[in-house]
């Protein structure tokens, strides 16, 4: 995920994000999920640094392996990162035939790159990540995630994703994947209408976008706005899907899956299934989470969310 700014309570001499209430525990506290916190026991702090954009920390947890934290908010853990990375990448790419050019916005840890590289039809993978430190730290501490950078099809651009998109020729990409963090601070722009308009312009007719779209348990007001914007901009298909990620707030995260006008895209029925046996080699390892059955099921919504999201289409 890309940069975000969050306020956090609790501090010790070790790190401002180690809880003063539960010594030796990392606690994730944010105005985006008031009244609750998620905590992991810290075995050892492995890295702390401050980039031009955010505070970066890596720690060894007792139960989820190594953990990457940006401005006090968990971005990934070794144990459950597969549930996010595999779904945000394969939901769009398995829904269109033979994707060739893919753009990743954010995703500095390299996990989305790893998943995109499983698709043999892909010829070009561009990634624009704003924070070079995230890339470097991920390569050092999360080699099984950052392995995506080793693919020769990958072109890394360090810079602002919004500006990058504005300079892209119209109709360049088959798919755009936006691996952003929460809509606060530097990532705020990645949830606003002009950004979605830039994505639509950068996609070919019938091209697809997959973007992080928050939790139905915490952010229905944000999701409502995103859905409304997407329905105005993407004239093909607009859908909300979700996955479970234990270390994300509320234990789940959603995605917007949209297509531009052109060849029809039915996201709920994957036409480009990825063969797990053929999708990995010794470098990447097998997929741990995504499969075609889960792909279809991810678009099934609880009634309360379904009512709100469907109402935005009327």
From Swiss-Prot:
The keyword Transferase applies. Pathway: Amine and polyamine biosynthesis; spermidine biosynthesis; spermidine from putrescine: step 1/1. One of its GO terms (cellular component) is cytosol. Pfam families: Spermine_synt_N (PF17284), Spermine_synth (PF01564). The active site is at 179 (proton acceptor). Residues 23-260 form the PABS domain. Keywords: Polyamine biosynthesis, Spermidine biosynthesis, Transferase. One of its GO terms (molecular function) is spermidine synthase activity. It is an enzyme of class 2 (transferase). SUPFAM superfamilies: S-adenosyl-L-methionine-dependent methyltransferases (SSF53335). Root, stem and leaf. Its EC number is 2.5.1.16. Belongs to the spermidine/spermine synthase family. NCBIfam families: PRK00811.1, speE. This is Spermidine synthase.
